[in-house]
């Protein structure tokens, strides 16, 4: 199945039902009052983030989504039923934009998260609303309001914990297949991977994590060169970036700098993302490790986060798995620690507010006692 991470489509919320002009027609009641019902509200168009949907491919075959209009009001004070909402399942990690302005309307990054992308029109009012002392037989009702309609753009940003980045033919796809059960297309020529590939990395005694192989970036990718510009947004949500460098290349350090510059040019905060440097194909080339300390220091890397591996033979892959797991564990610990600190500060704030309220209450009671 093709991987589609961008789609344009049209949504139309339901129009409101019209109000009704009607009067009581009963035996022995020659001049019955108005009893026209109100129109029902039009249905909304609602987007729902669902893990069951992995791609936007369905939008290739259906580009228009419409909610049901509200039912018209009827006589005998019968109000119209509201129109049924139109629910759209989209992948978790989708960003919804206004197609014309490019303004971000929603970022659905949690399972089950919902967003009303188009509001249904309100129902029209029946003629009882227009009855008055001077007009007991109003022959007027209002029409329902039109539902919202608009063209929208969805961009999918993969919800991966780890992103594999590197120049074409650095060995990312082979590494992904070693790390997970994924089976990406692998060959010895650039741009074999034409779309992001996902794999699941399982740890003993830990939760699993998702790894994404981002298609080969090249110099100038953030400006539209090569294929990488189409997929740079998929690295935004990753917790860890694994830079896969071909150790047998003419200048592997330069290759690292190219990717680092592209990520930084696309979004500055990516420069501060947790990084692992993997020098791949160490079985094919005797790398001069004496050059490594100066490079690590100049780029601000942590020595323990620099590994030599061979994705083909599996050499060093176990160390990489352990390192990824350790970094994720540390991140989760720091997140939990921060959350608990925020809760502690919130509780302290509430405690001080309560003490202040009690103090004011006591002062008020003392003042009342003096007045008495």
UniProtKB/Swiss-Prot annotation:
Domain Obg: 1-159
Residues at which Mg(2+) binds: 173, 193
One Gene Ontology cellular component: cytoplasm
Coiled coil: none
Positions bound to GTP: 166-173, 191-195, 213-216, 280-283, 310-312
Matching InterPro entries: G_OBG, GTP-bd, GTP-bd_Obg/CgtA, GTP1-OBG_CS, GTP1_OBG_dom, GTP1_OBG_dom_sf, OBG_GTPase, P-loop_NTPase
Enzyme Commission number: 3.6.5.-
Location within or outside the cell: Cytoplasm
Keyword set includes Cytoplasm: yes
Chief localization: cytoplasm
Region of interest called Disordered, as start-end residue ranges on this chain: 121-141, 346-372
Domain OBG-type G stretches: 160-329
Keyword line: Cytoplasm, GTP-binding, Hydrolase, Magnesium, Metal-binding, Nucleotide-binding
GO annotation terms (biological process): ribosome biogenesis
Pfam families per UniProt: GTP1_OBG, MMR_HSR1
GO molecular function: GTP binding; GTPase activity; magnesium ion binding
Described function: An essential GTPase which binds GTP, GDP and possibly (p)ppGpp with moderate affinity, with high nucleotide exchange rates and a fairly low GTP hydrolysis rate. Plays a role in control of the cell cycle, stress response, ribosome biogenesis and in those bacteria that undergo differentiation, in morphogenesis control.
Self-association and partners: Monomer.
Protein name: GTPase Obg
Upper taxonomic lineage: Bacteria, Pseudomonadati, Thermodesulfobacteriota, Desulfobulbia, Desulfobulbales
């Amino acid at each position: 199945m093709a991987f589609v991470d961008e789609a344009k489509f049209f949504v139309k919320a339901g129009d409101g039902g019209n109000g009704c002009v009607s009067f009581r027609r009963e035996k022995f009641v020659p001049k019955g009052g108005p009893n026209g019902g109100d129109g029902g509200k039009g249905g909304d168009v609602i987007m729902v983030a669902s893990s069951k949907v992995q791609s936007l491919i369905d939008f290739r075959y259906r580009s228009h989504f419409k909610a049901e209009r509200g039912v018209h009001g009827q006589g005998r004070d019968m109000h119209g039923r509201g129109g049924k909402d139109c629910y759209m399942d989209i992948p978790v990690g989708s960003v919804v934009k206004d197609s014309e302005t490019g303004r971000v309307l929603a970022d659905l990054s949690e399972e089950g998260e919902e967003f009303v992308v188009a509001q249904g029109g309100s129902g029209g009012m029946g003629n009882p609303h227009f009855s008055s002392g001077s007009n007991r037989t109003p022959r007027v009702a209002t029409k329902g309001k039109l539902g919202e309609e608009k063209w929208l753009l969805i961009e999918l940003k993969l919800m991966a914990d780890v992103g594999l980045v590197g120049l074409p033919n650095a060995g990312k796809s082979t590494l992904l297949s070693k790390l997970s059960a994924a089976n990406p297309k692998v060959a010895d020529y650039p741009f074999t991977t034409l779309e992001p590939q996902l794999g699941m990395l399982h740890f003993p005694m830990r939760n699993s994590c998702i790894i994404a192989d981002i298609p080969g970036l090249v110099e100038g990718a953030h400006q539209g060169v090569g294929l990488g510009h189409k997929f740079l947004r998929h690295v935004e949500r990753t917790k860890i970036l694994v830079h896969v460098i071909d150790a047998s290349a003419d200048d592997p350090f330069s290759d690292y700098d190219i990717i680092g510059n592209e990520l930084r040019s696309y979004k500055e905060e990516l420069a501060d993302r947790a990084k692992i440097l993997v020098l791949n194909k160490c079985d094919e080339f005797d790398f001069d490790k004496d050059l490594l300390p100066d490079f690590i220091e100049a780029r601000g890397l942590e020595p323990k986060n620099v590994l030599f591996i061979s994705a083909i033979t599996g050499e060093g892959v176990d160390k990489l798995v352990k390192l990824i797991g350790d970094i994720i564990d540390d991140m989760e610990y720091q997140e939990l620690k921060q959350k608990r600190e925020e809760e502690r500060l919130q509780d302290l704030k509430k405690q001080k507010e309560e003490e202040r309220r009690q103090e004011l209450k006591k002062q008020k009671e003392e003042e009342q006692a003096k007045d008495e």
